[in-house]
């Protein structure tokens, strides 16, 4: 709450400098890094999926709260990744779909600008003891293209697959893939690649959960609890 108020005050000023912005970022990471923690091992659970269902608590039945109440650590890839993904798509369109070089140049410039904005945050996270900086969008694309074509650009497209692989590499192999009922892009690049992900990463523990006004909340809860039971078993095995 303290840093929320500080950030609101900073961003509502007439002028915001990058120096002050990065200073606040470093201070936020430092303070969170110094919070005393209990010596408790929890399974890390990544959350991916359709952009609205993923980030809006009311749309995913407050999934983060549920996971934390069940004793797990929720891991959420950032929203900036989706913006970078939208810009990165221009390179595939230029190389294979006849899009203009000008469009690719503009979008690559946008990527550089967005990366410049979050450079301070990534550096602070990299230097921290507890946090992992996000990968570049090019790194995420390279992870995804082994399983799906980068031409999958409808909705979250290849980003969804790339985020799941990135989560597995970062120790969050337990993943909930949130999707609206009958969302075709998600079924292809989310649910559709789970089998291949399990083949490539045997330790992966992934479930796809449909969120829809007509969907049974009990079924959602049962699937998530079953995944968490497997996650806890895997955690116990790794500690022995």
Named regions from a protein language model:
Residues 1-240:
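An N-terminal assembly and electron-transfer interface module characteristic of large anaerobic redox
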């Amino acid at each position: 709450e303290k840093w929320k108020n500080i950030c609101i005050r900073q961003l509502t000023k007439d002028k915001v400098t990058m120096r002050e912005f990065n200073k606040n970022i470093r201070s936020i990471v430092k303070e969170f890094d110094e919070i005393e923690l209990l010596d408790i091992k929890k399974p890390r659970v990544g959350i991916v999926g359709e952009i609205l269902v993923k980030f809006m608590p009311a749309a995913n039945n407050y999934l983060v709260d549920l996971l934390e109440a069940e004793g797990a650590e929720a891991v959420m890839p950032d929203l900036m990744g989706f913006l970078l993904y939208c810009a990165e798509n221009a390179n595939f369109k230029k190389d294979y779909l006849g899009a203009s070089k000008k469009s690719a140049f503009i979008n690559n410039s946008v990527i550089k600008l967005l990366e410049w904005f979050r450079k301070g945050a990534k550096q602070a996270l990299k230097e921290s003891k507890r946090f992992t900086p996000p990968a570049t969008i090019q790194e995420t694309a390279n992870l995804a293209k082994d399983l799906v074509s980068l031409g999958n650009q409808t909705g979250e497209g290849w980003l969804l697959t790339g985020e799941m692989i990135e989560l597995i590499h970062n120790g969050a192999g337990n993943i909930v893939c949130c999707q609206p009922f009958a969302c075709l892009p998600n079924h292809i690049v989310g649910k559709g690649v789970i089998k291949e992900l399990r083949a490539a990463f045997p330790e992966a523990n992934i479930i796809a959960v449909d969120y829809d006004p007509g969907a049974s909340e009990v079924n959602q809860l049962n699937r998530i609890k079953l995944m968490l039971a497997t996650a806890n078993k895997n955690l116990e095995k790794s500690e022995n």
